[in-house]
Protein backbone atom coordinates (compact mmCIF):
# COMPACT_ATOMS: atom_id res chain seq x y z
CA UNK A 1 0.00 0.00 0.00
CA UNK A 2 3.03 2.24 -0.33
CA UNK A 3 3.61 2.68 3.41
CA UNK A 4 7.13 2.42 4.77
CA UNK A 5 7.97 -0.34 7.25
CA UNK A 6 11.02 -0.37 9.51
CA UNK A 7 12.72 -3.76 9.88
CA UNK A 8 14.53 -4.70 13.08
CA UNK A 9 16.87 -6.85 10.98
CA UNK A 10 18.33 -5.54 7.74
CA UNK A 11 17.57 -7.20 4.40
CA UNK A 12 20.51 -8.70 2.48
CA UNK A 13 21.11 -8.36 -1.25
CA UNK A 14 22.30 -11.42 -3.17
CA UNK A 15 24.69 -11.03 -6.10
CA UNK A 16 22.78 -11.65 -9.33
CA UNK A 17 23.50 -10.19 -12.77
CA UNK A 18 19.95 -10.39 -14.15
CA UNK A 19 17.73 -9.62 -11.18
CA UNK A 20 17.96 -7.79 -7.89
CA UNK A 21 17.32 -10.36 -5.16
CA UNK A 22 16.78 -9.32 -1.55
CA UNK A 23 16.61 -11.68 1.42
CA UNK A 24 14.18 -10.39 4.05
CA UNK A 25 13.61 -12.22 7.38
CA UNK A 26 10.30 -14.10 7.04
CA UNK A 27 8.74 -12.87 10.29
CA UNK A 28 9.73 -9.29 9.51
CA UNK A 29 8.15 -9.53 6.07
CA UNK A 30 4.88 -10.90 7.48
CA UNK A 31 4.77 -8.14 10.07
CA UNK A 32 5.40 -5.43 7.50
CA UNK A 33 2.67 -6.83 5.22
CA UNK A 34 0.27 -7.27 8.14
CA UNK A 35 -0.07 -11.00 7.50
CA UNK A 36 -0.89 -13.52 10.21
CA UNK A 37 0.92 -16.87 10.08
CA UNK A 38 -0.26 -20.07 11.76
CA UNK A 39 1.58 -23.38 11.40
CA UNK A 40 -0.23 -26.67 11.73
CA UNK A 41 0.49 -30.34 12.34
CA UNK A 42 4.23 -31.02 12.24
CA UNK A 43 5.19 -27.50 11.22
CA UNK A 44 5.44 -28.33 7.50
CA UNK A 45 2.04 -26.87 6.73
CA UNK A 46 0.69 -23.48 7.62
CA UNK A 47 -1.86 -20.80 6.98
CA UNK A 48 -1.06 -17.29 5.83
CA UNK A 49 -3.88 -14.89 6.47
CA UNK A 50 -4.03 -11.25 5.46
CA UNK A 51 -4.28 -9.20 8.61
CA UNK A 52 -7.69 -7.67 9.06
CA UNK A 53 -7.80 -7.24 12.79
CA UNK A 54 -7.65 -3.91 14.52
CA UNK A 55 -6.69 -4.22 18.17
CA UNK A 56 -7.25 -0.55 18.89
CA UNK A 57 -9.78 0.16 21.61
CA UNK A 58 -10.68 2.47 24.45
CA UNK A 59 -8.23 2.94 27.31
CA UNK A 60 -9.09 3.46 30.97
CA UNK A 61 -6.72 3.89 33.90
CA UNK A 62 -6.61 2.40 37.38
CA UNK A 63 -5.03 4.53 40.11
CA UNK A 64 -2.61 2.60 42.30
CA UNK A 65 -2.25 3.30 46.03
CA UNK A 66 1.46 4.13 45.84
CA UNK A 67 3.86 6.30 43.89
CA UNK A 68 5.84 4.58 41.16
CA UNK A 69 9.08 4.60 43.20
CA UNK A 70 7.37 3.30 46.34
CA UNK A 71 5.59 0.55 44.43
CA UNK A 72 8.90 -0.66 42.96
CA UNK A 73 10.43 -0.84 46.44
CA UNK A 74 7.47 -2.72 47.88
CA UNK A 75 7.36 -5.23 45.04
CA UNK A 76 11.11 -5.82 45.30
CA UNK A 77 10.89 -6.29 49.07
CA UNK A 78 8.04 -8.77 48.66
CA UNK A 79 9.60 -10.78 45.81
CA UNK A 80 13.23 -10.14 44.89
CA UNK A 81 13.20 -12.52 41.92
CA UNK A 82 13.81 -9.44 39.77
CA UNK A 83 16.13 -6.49 40.30
CA UNK A 84 14.79 -3.01 41.01
CA UNK A 85 15.84 -2.04 37.50
CA UNK A 86 13.81 -4.91 36.08
CA UNK A 87 10.81 -3.98 38.21
CA UNK A 88 11.07 -0.43 36.91
CA UNK A 89 10.72 -1.69 33.35
CA UNK A 90 8.01 -4.23 34.21
CA UNK A 91 5.85 -1.70 36.04
CA UNK A 92 6.16 1.13 33.54
CA UNK A 93 3.73 0.86 30.63
CA UNK A 94 6.33 2.32 28.27
CA UNK A 95 8.42 -0.81 28.89
CA UNK A 96 5.63 -3.10 27.69
CA UNK A 97 6.69 -5.85 25.27
CA UNK A 98 3.24 -7.45 24.83
CA UNK A 99 1.70 -4.83 22.54
CA UNK A 100 -0.56 -3.88 25.50
CA UNK A 101 -2.11 -7.33 25.81
CA UNK A 102 -1.10 -7.55 29.47
CA UNK A 103 -3.38 -4.52 29.96
CA UNK A 104 -6.31 -5.93 28.00
CA UNK A 105 -9.48 -6.28 30.05
CA UNK A 106 -10.23 -9.99 30.36
CA UNK A 107 -13.52 -9.72 32.27
CA UNK A 108 -15.67 -10.24 29.19
CA UNK A 109 -16.18 -12.99 26.63
CA UNK A 110 -14.93 -11.67 23.29
CA UNK A 111 -16.09 -13.36 20.13
CA UNK A 112 -13.55 -15.55 18.39
CA UNK A 113 -13.34 -17.35 15.07
CA UNK A 114 -13.99 -20.95 16.26
CA UNK A 115 -12.10 -22.71 13.47
CA UNK A 116 -9.04 -20.50 13.87
CA UNK A 117 -9.21 -20.98 17.63
CA UNK A 118 -9.44 -24.78 17.45
CA UNK A 119 -6.50 -24.94 15.07
CA UNK A 120 -4.34 -22.55 17.04
CA UNK A 121 -5.26 -24.14 20.38
CA UNK A 122 -4.15 -27.60 19.25
CA UNK A 123 -1.11 -26.21 17.46
CA UNK A 124 0.15 -24.62 20.69
CA UNK A 125 -0.13 -27.95 22.50
CA UNK A 126 1.61 -29.78 19.64
CA UNK A 127 4.52 -27.33 19.70
CA UNK A 128 4.93 -27.68 23.48
CA UNK A 129 4.85 -31.48 23.29
CA UNK A 130 7.29 -31.55 20.38
CA UNK A 131 9.75 -29.31 22.24
CA UNK A 132 9.48 -31.52 25.32
CA UNK A 133 9.78 -34.70 23.22
CA UNK A 134 6.43 -36.19 24.11
CA UNK A 135 3.35 -37.23 22.20
CA UNK A 136 0.52 -34.72 21.93
CA UNK A 137 -1.66 -37.50 23.35
CA UNK A 138 0.11 -36.91 26.68
CA UNK A 139 -1.87 -33.68 27.00
CA UNK A 140 -5.34 -34.02 28.51
CA UNK A 141 -6.25 -30.71 26.86
CA UNK A 142 -5.54 -31.76 23.30
CA UNK A 143 -8.41 -32.06 20.85
CA UNK A 144 -11.34 -30.13 19.46
CA UNK A 145 -13.69 -31.42 22.19
CA UNK A 146 -11.52 -29.92 24.93
CA UNK A 147 -11.09 -26.66 23.02
CA UNK A 148 -14.89 -26.39 22.83
CA UNK A 149 -15.16 -27.15 26.55
CA UNK A 150 -12.68 -24.36 27.31
CA UNK A 151 -14.72 -21.89 25.26
CA UNK A 152 -17.87 -23.00 27.06
CA UNK A 153 -16.29 -22.49 30.49
CA UNK A 154 -14.97 -19.04 29.50
CA UNK A 155 -18.41 -17.99 28.27
CA UNK A 156 -20.19 -19.31 31.36
CA UNK A 157 -17.94 -17.35 33.72
CA UNK A 158 -17.54 -14.30 31.48
CA UNK A 159 -13.82 -14.58 30.81
CA UNK A 160 -11.94 -13.66 27.67
CA UNK A 161 -11.50 -17.06 25.95
CA UNK A 162 -8.08 -16.36 24.45
CA UNK A 163 -6.73 -15.21 27.81
CA UNK A 164 -8.30 -18.24 29.52
CA UNK A 165 -6.61 -20.57 27.04
CA UNK A 166 -3.21 -18.93 27.67
CA UNK A 167 -3.66 -19.08 31.44
CA UNK A 168 -4.73 -22.72 31.28
CA UNK A 169 -1.72 -23.65 29.15
CA UNK A 170 0.65 -22.07 31.67
CA UNK A 171 -1.05 -23.52 34.77
CA UNK A 172 -1.27 -27.08 33.46
CA UNK A 173 1.94 -27.28 31.41
CA UNK A 174 -0.29 -27.51 28.35
CA UNK A 175 -2.27 -30.31 29.96
CA UNK A 176 0.75 -32.47 30.80
CA UNK A 177 1.33 -31.75 34.51
CA UNK A 178 0.77 -34.51 37.05
CA UNK A 179 -2.28 -32.80 38.55
CA UNK A 180 -3.70 -32.03 35.12
CA UNK A 181 -3.40 -35.63 33.92
CA UNK A 182 -5.50 -36.77 36.83
CA UNK A 183 -5.61 -39.50 39.43
CA UNK A 184 -8.14 -42.18 40.27
CA UNK A 185 -9.72 -41.87 43.69
CA UNK A 186 -12.11 -44.68 44.36
CA UNK A 187 -13.98 -45.44 41.16
CA UNK A 188 -13.53 -42.04 39.52
CA UNK A 189 -10.58 -40.16 38.08
CA UNK A 190 -10.27 -36.50 39.06
CA UNK A 191 -8.35 -33.63 37.43
CA UNK A 192 -6.92 -30.40 38.84
CA UNK A 193 -5.72 -28.26 35.94
CA UNK A 194 -4.65 -25.24 37.99
CA UNK A 195 -3.20 -27.01 41.02
CA UNK A 196 -5.84 -25.34 43.20
CA UNK A 197 -5.36 -26.08 46.92
CA UNK A 198 -2.33 -28.23 46.05
CA UNK A 199 -0.28 -27.28 49.10
CA UNK A 200 3.50 -27.47 48.81
CA UNK A 201 4.04 -30.12 51.50
CA UNK A 202 2.04 -32.65 49.44
CA UNK A 203 0.60 -31.08 46.28
CA UNK A 204 -0.74 -34.28 44.71
CA UNK A 205 -2.51 -35.44 47.85
CA UNK A 206 -4.22 -32.13 48.53
CA UNK A 207 -4.73 -31.18 44.89
CA UNK A 208 -6.53 -34.39 44.02
CA UNK A 209 -8.46 -34.36 47.28
CA UNK A 210 -9.79 -30.91 46.43
CA UNK A 211 -10.61 -32.00 42.88
CA UNK A 212 -12.66 -34.87 44.28
CA UNK A 213 -14.47 -32.53 46.66
CA UNK A 214 -15.36 -30.21 43.76
CA UNK A 215 -16.40 -33.05 41.47
CA UNK A 216 -13.83 -32.43 38.72
CA UNK A 217 -14.25 -35.87 37.20
CA UNK A 218 -13.72 -34.81 33.58
CA UNK A 219 -11.64 -32.26 31.69
CA UNK A 220 -14.74 -30.17 30.95
CA UNK A 221 -15.63 -30.07 34.66
CA UNK A 222 -12.03 -29.23 35.58
CA UNK A 223 -12.07 -26.38 33.05
CA UNK A 224 -15.29 -25.04 34.53
CA UNK A 225 -13.75 -25.27 37.98
CA UNK A 226 -10.69 -23.33 36.83
CA UNK A 227 -12.84 -20.67 35.17
CA UNK A 228 -14.98 -20.31 38.30
CA UNK A 229 -11.83 -20.00 40.42
CA UNK A 230 -10.41 -17.20 38.27
CA UNK A 231 -13.74 -15.43 37.90
CA UNK A 232 -14.98 -15.38 41.48
CA UNK A 233 -11.58 -15.21 43.16
CA UNK A 234 -9.89 -12.55 41.04
CA UNK A 235 -11.31 -11.21 37.81
CA UNK A 236 -14.93 -10.58 38.86
CA UNK A 237 -14.19 -10.37 42.59
CA UNK A 238 -14.22 -7.26 44.79
CA UNK A 239 -10.52 -6.88 43.95
CA UNK A 240 -11.35 -6.32 40.24
CA UNK A 241 -8.10 -7.80 38.95
CA UNK A 242 -9.46 -7.75 35.42
CA UNK A 243 -6.21 -7.53 33.46
CA UNK A 244 -3.20 -9.83 33.41
CA UNK A 245 -1.11 -6.97 34.76
CA UNK A 246 -3.43 -6.43 37.74
CA UNK A 247 -3.46 -10.16 38.49
CA UNK A 248 0.29 -9.95 39.12
CA UNK A 249 0.59 -6.31 40.20
CA UNK A 250 -2.42 -5.56 42.34
CA UNK A 251 -3.57 -1.96 42.77
CA UNK A 252 -4.67 -2.84 46.33
CA UNK A 253 -2.80 -1.41 49.29
CA UNK A 254 -0.39 -3.77 51.00
CA UNK A 255 0.11 -5.75 47.77
CA UNK A 256 -2.68 -8.01 48.96
CA UNK A 257 -4.17 -10.65 46.69
CA UNK A 258 -1.59 -11.07 43.93
CA UNK A 259 -2.24 -14.10 41.73
CA UNK A 260 1.40 -14.95 40.99
CA UNK A 261 4.81 -14.38 42.56
CA UNK A 262 6.84 -14.48 39.32
CA UNK A 263 7.67 -10.83 38.45
CA UNK A 264 7.56 -11.72 34.75
CA UNK A 265 4.16 -13.45 34.93
CA UNK A 266 2.25 -10.65 33.15
CA UNK A 267 4.79 -10.55 30.32
CA UNK A 268 4.73 -14.32 29.89
CA UNK A 269 0.95 -14.59 29.71
CA UNK A 270 0.68 -11.32 27.78
CA UNK A 271 3.16 -12.51 25.18
CA UNK A 272 1.26 -15.74 24.61
CA UNK A 273 -1.98 -13.75 24.57
CA UNK A 274 -0.60 -11.47 21.86
CA UNK A 275 0.46 -14.51 19.84
CA UNK A 276 -3.02 -16.06 20.02
CA UNK A 277 -4.92 -12.82 19.36
CA UNK A 278 -5.35 -13.90 15.72
CA UNK A 279 -8.20 -16.08 17.05
CA UNK A 280 -10.53 -13.11 17.59
CA UNK A 281 -13.35 -12.47 15.17
CA UNK A 282 -13.18 -9.32 13.09
CA UNK A 283 -15.88 -7.55 15.11
CA UNK A 284 -14.36 -8.11 18.56
CA UNK A 285 -14.17 -5.02 20.79
CA UNK A 286 -11.14 -4.19 22.92
CA UNK A 287 -10.68 -2.29 26.17
CA UNK A 288 -7.37 -1.60 27.90
CA UNK A 289 -6.78 -0.65 31.54
CA UNK A 290 -3.43 1.00 32.22
CA UNK A 291 -1.84 1.69 35.64
CA UNK A 292 -1.61 5.22 37.04
CA UNK A 293 0.67 5.66 40.05
CA UNK A 294 0.21 8.37 42.66
Language-model segment annotations:
Residues 27, 31, 148-152, 165, ...:
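Solvent-exposed, polar/charged alpha-helical surfaces in well-ordered, non-transmembrane soluble domains
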Residues 21, 142-149, 158-161:
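Short, glycine/acidic-rich beta->alpha junctions
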Residues 151-154, 159-175:
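Short, functionally critical alpha-helical segments immediately adjacent to catalytic or ligand/cofactor-binding
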Residues 29, 48-81, 226, 286-294:
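Intrinsically disordered, low-complexity repeat and linker tracts
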Residues 62-63, 67-143, 172-238:
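Peptidoglycan-targeting cell-wall enzymes and recognition modules
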Residues 1-58, 64:
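Primary recognition of N-terminal secretory signal peptides and signal-anchoring hydrophobic helices
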Residues 194-294:
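Non-catalytic cell-wall polysaccharide-engagement segments
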Amino acid sequence: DGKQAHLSQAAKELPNKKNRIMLVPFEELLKALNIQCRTEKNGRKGVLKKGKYDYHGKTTRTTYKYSFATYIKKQYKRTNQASKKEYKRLLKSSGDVTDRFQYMRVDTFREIDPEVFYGYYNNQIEIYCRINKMSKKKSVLYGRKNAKALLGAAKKYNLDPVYFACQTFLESAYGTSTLAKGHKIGKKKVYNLYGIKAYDNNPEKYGFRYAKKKGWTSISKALEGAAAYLSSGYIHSKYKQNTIFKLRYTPNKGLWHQYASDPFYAEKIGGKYQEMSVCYSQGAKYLYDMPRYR
